[in-house]
Design a protein with these regions (language model features):
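A late-sequence structural motif
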Residues: 129-170
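Secondary-structure junction motif
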Residues: 65-87, 153-157, 161-162
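Residues embedded in well-ordered beta-strands
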Residues: 40-42, 48, 66, 113, ...
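Short secondary-structure boundary segments
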Residues: 22-23, 45, 117-120, 143
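C-terminal regulatory/effector modules of DNA-binding transcriptional regulators
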Residues: 93-125
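Short beta-strand-to-loop elements that line the ligand-binding cleft
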Residues: 1-2, 21-22, 89-99
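Short loop->beta-strand "edge-of-pocket" segments that line small-molecule binding or catalytic clefts
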Residues: 39, 48, 55-75, 168
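Short beta-strand-centered segments that line the small-molecule binding cleft or hinge
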Residues: 2-43, 56, 79, 103, ...
């Protein structure tokens, strides 16, 4: 569900909690970081970037990117934009995609390089795509728990949040 829809639902009381990859959600929504995941790059097999064991960020400026759809994955896209901000020029975006499968298909076909959370590597095992880490420690995406500031949560939601907190370090 897009971030904007989640925020509308949280503000209207339709939702008690939500999840996002950005903490930029407004003052009326509380954010709590739950877990962190490294970002890695998906590179076509036989690509010049494969000469690096860890891909330097500035090297990505020379190649087209396959990025997530900014409306469907708004929070994730914001964090990717923040990560790419140090590049000296606007990245060349070959395509925006609405699924991991489509991104991997386009990367495997040589259309560009994509980004994946490290926890999703197992879902990306394909002969035409190679995964490489980024050569930077700050290439991390955080998943946040969202909840309205003024809302008393149902007991079931409180229990669910307690379980998330227990397992957030795993």
């Amino acid at each position: 569900m897009p971030l904007a829809e989640q925020l509308r639902g949280l503000r209207s009381g339709d939702f008690s909690i939500g999840f996002a990859h950005t903490a930029e959600v407004g003052d009326d929504i509380l954010t709590e970081p739950l877990w962190h995941d490294s970002l890695v790059v998906a590179v076509p097999a036989r690509h010049p970037l494969l000469s690096h064991k860890a891909v330097p960020l500035h090297q990505l400026a020379s190649y087209p990117l396959v990025l997530c759809d900014p409306q469907v994955y708004e929070g994730y896209y914001r964090e990717l934009a923040r990560l790419l901000r140090p590049l000296e020029r606007q990245p060349d975006v070959a395509e925006h995609v609405s699924s991991l499968d489509m991104m991997l298909t386009l990367v495997g076909a040589g259309y560009g390089v994509g980004f994946i959370r490290a926890s999703r590597i197992a879902a990306t095992l394909r002969p035409d795509v190679v995964i490489r880490p980024l050569a930077m420690d700050s290439a991390v995406i955080t998943t946040y728990l969202l909840r309205p500031v003024s809302e008393d949560l149902p007991v079931s939601a409180e229990r669910f949040i307690a379980r998330l907190r227990e397992h957030s370090g795993d």
